Every structure is written in structure tokens, then in C-alpha cells.
């Protein structure tokens, strides 16, 4: 199949697959300013921690391009404002701040150069983030494939594929690797309410690649696990604390609890850029709350009565004791997590 590119930057425009429109329509969303990128991240045109990080980096490039004709002092003021706007697009995914910090360091390091040279340096750094993500995902996939047995039945949650990254994917990247290495795997994909990333995105990627799979309602997962029909669970991550506590799409924690009860291996697949070395535990992770309409409506159609209140956290935190291992591009991290995570710093 044709390679899925969730992000592409060419001719000073950032092109994104509009993930709000999948699977029924394949449309490209064009970002010509950093404000467009801010909108795309907030409104989930682009989603998935690694993809958000790469998009944010190119957002800084677009900001630099926009302000090139300003006086130096104004240029740096405007860039600082743009960095702030982009950094605050969404609060939970650490890759967003990681990418913004990398771009900020480039500005600080090259502050004495001509503005056009600063722009070129920013473009080079964004390209590096983009290319690194692809390489990182392929390394993770190879390490992750080690935990996948022949004929394994895998359960996954949300979308962790090429759409959630620059390419290939994190947890879904491991699934791809196992499939292409001939392991005869089968996948159950949670639909992932309320945004339905499992049914709209993961199922779409699995169909595109010809990977044997079934889509299930989130509430079916516990029955499959109890009945011994799941060999391993693979999920992604939006932020990992020093002790291994992991913020991921809402519903991940629930899966980890059931997996622990029935002794099913539960792996997090994420690049080391998703580890937040500045927080000790998941208690410090800010959990984004999103619009009530995501729960009360599906595709614009109201499914709940007027007047009902809604609680809609986008993520939950899975405690480290429920996690079998964290698969990264540097290998598989096992408990004790803090001790082993610090070795990666």
C-alpha cells in the first residue's frame, strides 16, 4: 500500500491528513501560519503525541517565516508569542512541549545570526524531528516485536499508527512489524469513545495494510481478556512520568486493571521523547478535559438529552505497577521504572 504520511512540509506549507474526516473522506488540511497549526492541534486535525510534536515544530518554522520582514526586536517578540501559543495548544502530550523546547533552543543558540539564517536553522531542526520520529518508530517496532509470539492475538486502544506519528507508528508500529515478519497475528481494536479513534483511524490503517482484525466496542474488551482470548495488550502514551505512570487515551487505565487481574501482558509503546523527566509520578500530569459535545453527539447528531451534564477527560493515568514494560527506541524498560528510566536520560 501507499505509505501513510500524516504530516508533510513543502513549499512553506504544512500538509496534514485531516483525521476528523476519516474514514469516510480523505482530505488534506493546509497550515500556512502557526495559528493554523495551533487550530489543527486543538481541534484534532492532527493527533497522537509524536505527530503533534512534529506539527508544533513546523508551526514554529511557519511563525519564523511570517515574521522575517520585521525588525529583529519585533521578530523575537513575535516568535516568543508564537512559541507560547503553540505550546498551549493541548496540555497533556509532552512531545508538544519537547518539540517547542527544541525549537526554542535553536533560536537562542543562533540569536546573533541573520533572521533568514535563524529561519533556516529552525527548518533544519523541524526536519530532524520529523526524520528522527520515523527512525525511532522503526526501532521501537523491532524491540516490540520481541514480545509478540507466533499467532498472537493483540488488543490495542485508540490510534497509535502512522496517523499518530510522522510514520509507521508506536504500538501499531509493533503490530505492523509482527505482521510483516510473518507471525500470523490477529488484532482486536477498541473503538475508543468518545472520539472513536479506534474505529475511525486504527481500523482504517489495519484495513489499508491488510492486517487481520476485528473492531470492538470498548466494553467488549474485558470479556475477551477474561475468556483468555487476548495474548498481549499494546497501547501508546502521551506522557510518562519518572516512576513509569503513563497518561494515555481515556480507557487505557481500565484495560490495565483487567489485564492485571487476568495476567495478560500490558505494554506501553512510546519514544523516550514522551518521558517527562521533570515529574515524579502521574499525579503531576495535567489531564485535558474536552468539549461535552464529544460525548453528547456523534458526527454532529445528538445522542444524549438536552440538559445532561458531561465529564469528558481526554486521558487517564495508568499506574506503573499495571505495566509489564515500556517499549522505547532504546529497548524495553522493565521495573523498577524510575531507576531504569533515569539510565536513559
Curated annotation (Swiss-Prot):
Substrate binds at residues 47-49, 90, 197, 248-249. Disulfide bonds: none annotated. InterPro entries: IF-2B-related (IPR000649), IF-M1Pi (IPR005251), IF_2B-like_C (IPR042529), Initiation_fac_2B_a/b/d (IPR011559), M1Pi_N (IPR027363), NagB/RpiA_transferase-like (IPR037171). GO terms for biological process: L-methionine salvage from methylthioadenosine. Its EC number is 5.3.1.23. It holds the Pfam family IF-2B. Signal peptide: none annotated. The active site is at 238 (proton donor). The record marks 158 as: Transition state stabilizer. It catalyses: 5-(methylsulfanyl)-alpha-D-ribose 1-phosphate = 5-(methylsulfanyl)-D-ribulose 1-phosphate. Belongs to the eIF-2B alpha/beta/delta subunits family. MtnA subfamily. PANTHER family: METHYLTHIORIBOSE-1-PHOSPHATE ISOMERASE. This is Methylthioribose-1-phosphate isomerase.
